[in-house]
Amino acid sequence: MDYGMISQIEKARLYAEEPERITFKTLNSTFRGDNNTYVISLDESGWHCTCPGFQSHHICPHIMTIERLLKPMLKIAPVPYAPGQNVVSDVKKMHRYAEEIDRIVFNSFQVSIQGNNSDHSVGYDQGTWTCDSNSFRLRGVSSHTIAMERLLKGMLREQVAT
């Protein structure tokens, strides 16, 4: 019996129950909206979406949905409503989209996780995980990557493809 792995699974459960330990640094996702499929990203300059609503108002129901789903893990202020934005329609869409997570696929992201002993960097890119923890270097998996898999269940590229 691999007691080290059992410990990693238990830590992952605890980390997933405390999503405020996690900070998204960057992300790239595909979002299947009602009319088209869009690419949403977050980087040091802020949010971006390829939808027409974002191009005109710098906010859209796609970003609002991601903000809602990842709220405790985003350490930035939500994008404010914009003049001319159809707020009622966008909020309704956001609520519906948040219940339909099969619309969202995370292609890549970079997060920082406050571990029990130190902070760790976790990356995900098209199904490939990276983590700077010793357990990841030894096993190719860690409590940090398992926690992210739990939190983003059904929205990761390899989970959607299978």
Predicted features along the sequence, with ranges:
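Long, low-complexity, compositionally biased intrinsically disordered regions
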Residues: 1-162
